[in-house]
Regions:
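P-loop NTP-binding core
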Residues: 1-242
Length: 242
């Protein structure tokens, strides 16, 4: 099993879009794929299940932290989903990080080849625990000063987690990149001196969100240009390990 956790302490950086594409890439490669949506907004769940009502239902990902049986939703694409919902805040109130190691063992025992986890930006067990469980933590960000500040906090958290999870791998993914922006290129050069950057970088493309609105990854979206399709296929294949 490979667990990929997508996280950032700043919202609105393309985290959920990446989660959906990683999961759909896994299914296309024949991997038994589970998405764990730990964000109370449940956006990944809504996109993948093609059902806005799913994010208002209890159960789902919350069952991981309890002794309740797991009941993943099987989506039309074939992936399994433990959905996010507004009641997940209660998990942070009653479960500590030490308890989350038990959750890791439970997760590792499940019959999946790939698990992709979407985390909330706020610090708590739903944010920290999945980084302890992961083989790879991916942090998407826009190359601007606000994102760099949040990245510093995220990387500090990852270094703390490495004290109990020495083999943890992390990568930073540049999203919404504008090639002609000198400021962005300077930020990226600075970042590259300190953290491992994942390539290719992602530029802003309307086709990416439009594809998910239709329930398909961008490389299967008829209105996406060839470059966008190839970039996303290469990126997701590299991150899921195949």
């Amino acid at each position: 099993m490979r667990i990929v956790t997508v996280t950032n302490q700043k919202g609105g950086v393309g985290k959920t879009t990446l989660v959906c594409h990683l999961a759909l890439a896994g299914v296309e490669r024949g991997l038994r794929t589970l998405v764990v949506d730990l964000d109370t907004q449940g956006n990944a769940s809504t996109m993948l299940a093609r059902d806005a009502a799913v994010a208002g239902q209890p159960g789902g990902a919350a069952a991981l932290f309890a002794d309740a049986p797991l009941a993943p939703t099987v989506t039309a694409s074939g992936l399994h989903l433990l959905h996010g919902h507004q009641h997940l805040d209660e998990v942070d109130q009653r479960v500590g990080l030490a308890d989350s190691r038990r959750v890791r063992d439970r997760l590792r025992a499940l019959p999946y080849d790939l698990v992709v986890i979407d985390t909330p930006p706020a610090i708590g067990v739903r944010h920290l625990g999945p980084q302890v469980w992961a083989d790879l933590v991916v942090t998407p960000l826009e190359p601007n000063s606000f994102s760099l500040l949040a990245l510093g906090q995220t990387l500090a958290t990852i270094e703390e987690i490495r004290s109990i999870r020495p083999g943890l791998e992390n990568r930073v993914l540049i999203n919404r990149f504008t090639r002609s922006s000198g400021q962005q290129n300077r930020y990226i050069a600075l970042l590259g001196e300190h953290v491992p950057l994942t390539r290719p970088f992602l530029t802003l493309r309307v086709a990416v969100s439009d594809a998910l609105d239709e329930g398909v990854p961008v490389w299967r979206f008829r209105r996406a240009d060839r470059e966008t399709r190839e970039i996303w296929m290469e990126l997701c294949g590299g991150l899921i390990g195949g």
